[in-house]
Amino acid sequence: MSMSDPIADMLTRIRNAQMVEKAVVLVPSSKVKVAIAQVLKDEGYIDGFSVKTDDGKSQLEIALKYYAGRPVIERIERVSRPGLRVYKGHGAIPQVMNGLGVAIVTTPQGVMTDRKARATGIGGEVLCYVA
């Protein structure tokens, strides 16, 4: 059976792995998931990631980050989903926790943070909020 929302599955796997303090989490890989992982790494929410290929199936291995025994990612939630897509112009992209968190946005120029999308003046689909 195919998965209806692979990005929500990735976010849930990260959330669940952090609740049990796992060091790494494996997620089925795709271009969008790799781009989201790159944004999370650039913003300091994860230690790193790598793509592993095993028996023709590529897996995204994400190294989770903790500070003082607590997960760095306090909240990660899906915004736009297959049943209800959420698109915003560059002026309407929301700030997460007054700029302390990030909204991950997919634009015609790729996946980026809300701050970068506002700075470049382009809008897109709001994938998730991370704080």
UniProtKB/Swiss-Prot annotation:
GO BP annotation list: translation
PROSITE patterns for this protein: RIBOSOMAL_S8 (PS00053)
GO cellular component, one term: ribosome
GO molecular function: rRNA binding; structural constituent of ribosome
Entries under Pfam families matching the protein: Ribosomal_S8 (PF00410)
InterPro entries per the UniProt record, alphabetical: Ribosomal_uS8, Ribosomal_uS8_CS, Ribosomal_uS8_sf
Annotated disulfide bonds: none
Keywords: Ribonucleoprotein, Ribosomal protein, RNA-binding, rRNA-binding
PANTHER family (alphabetical): 40S RIBOSOMAL PROTEIN S15A
Family: Belongs to the universal ribosomal protein uS8 family.
Subunit structure: Part of the 30S ribosomal subunit. Contacts proteins S5 and S12.
Cited HAMAP family: Ribosomal_uS8_B (MF_01302_B)
NCBIfam families: PRK00136.1
Function summary: One of the primary rRNA binding proteins, it binds directly to 16S rRNA central domain where it helps coordinate assembly of the platform of the 30S subunit.
Protein name: Small ribosomal subunit protein uS8
Gene: rpsH
